[in-house]
Amino acid sequence: MRAPGFWWSVPTALPARLLAPLGRLYGGQVARRMARPGASAPLPVICVGNVTLGGAGKTPTALALAGLLREIGHEPAFLSRGYGGRLPGPVRVDPAQHGAAEVGDEPLLLARAAPTIVARDRPAGAALCAAADATAIIMDDGLQNPSLRKDWSIAVFDAGVGIGNGLAFPAGPLRAPLAAQWPHIDAVLIIGEGPAGEPVAADAVRRGLPVIRAQLRPEPGAAAALAGRPVLAFAGIGRPDKFFESLRAAGAEIRATRAFPDHHAYRAADLAGLERLARREGLTLVTTEKDRVRLPAAAPVTVLPVSLHFSEPDAALLRARLAALGPAPPDPRTRPD
């Protein structure tokens, strides 16, 4: 779905006021669900979630945390519901066999970095993570899902939009009232620059929660290859404009853009239309990694990969917090006979 513009406006906007009663009902139901006790997992569970619907940068955050876990000796596995995929799981994602229609787009990206389990039944998925010889689980999304007990939850916020109008769906972007979600959050991560993230940061500090800041940066080689090139940029993610901004920052000359709904299942007609326009205008088709896995392998599309970067003090804080969840077990290959 595409987020309606009034979500990012004031809460007194007419559509928001009309939908506010439904938002109170929906948000209250989610809040009550979040309060249920969850099953214990065989491994420490780190939840990367957000308080709003749509993209905030959870997948790059999960990948960055996996790197930090490896630095302190852990072997992470990712656990995902597999949004947009038809397989209920639990199943280990194999990019050579699975497509986005089966397991969703994010799991295909995560599986490049570590064992990735798709499971609508999160406790069953956690058991399969343990069977994959992981020592820690990174749950991509799931802050509002109570089925699995989390050891540490980090809420990701986009500094450009924050919590929007502060109302619960469908009146606004919140999955539940923010006051009901704070007790389930152990740290706040604000990605990018913008004033909308500052009220969230101030609220977190008042609650004694650490506030970590990070930036999404394009892969240098890919950015250099696009510098000065005329492009047709397209994306079906939570905030396509963020991707277009990244392309401009990389020096690409954006001649046209096309925004699709988040997790859009591209049809042959979509791609054919994009290719026609690109050929006619002499443009390079460019999209995100997440969109690329939803396209045919032979599609003539260039990708601009991005990754999340922390300052060293924030990276050190994260390493310390992750280490506090428990030491990684010794590698059996290093044990003396």
Swiss-Prot record:
Pfam family, one: LpxK
Reaction catalysis annotation: a lipid A disaccharide + ATP = a lipid IVA + ADP + H(+)
Disulfide linkage: none
InterPro entries: LpxK, P-loop_NTPase
GO biological process: lipid A biosynthetic process; lipopolysaccharide core region biosynthetic process
Transmembrane region(s): none
One Gene Ontology MF term: tetraacyldisaccharide 4'-kinase activity
Record-level GO cellular component terms: plasma membrane
Keywords, ordered alphabetically: ATP-binding, Kinase, Lipid A biosynthesis, Lipid biosynthesis, Lipid metabolism, Nucleotide-binding, Transferase
EC nos: 2.7.1.130
Residues reported in the UniProt entry to bind ATP: T52, L53, G54, G55, A56, G57, K58, T59
Pathway given in the UniProt record: Glycolipid biosynthesis; lipid IV(A) biosynthesis; lipid IV(A) from (3R)-3-hydroxytetradecanoyl-[acyl-carrier-protein] and UDP-N-acetyl-alpha-D-glucosamine: step 6/6
HAMAP family linked: LpxK
Function: Transfers the gamma-phosphate of ATP to the 4'-position of a tetraacyldisaccharide 1-phosphate intermediate (termed DS-1-P) to form tetraacyldisaccharide 1,4'-bis-phosphate (lipid IVA).
UniProt xrefs under PANTHER family: TETRAACYLDISACCHARIDE 4'-KINASE (PTHR42724), TETRAACYLDISACCHARIDE 4'-KINASE, MITOCHONDRIAL-RELATED (PTHR42724:SF1)
Protein name, per record: Tetraacyldisaccharide 4'-kinase
Gene expressing this chain: lpxK
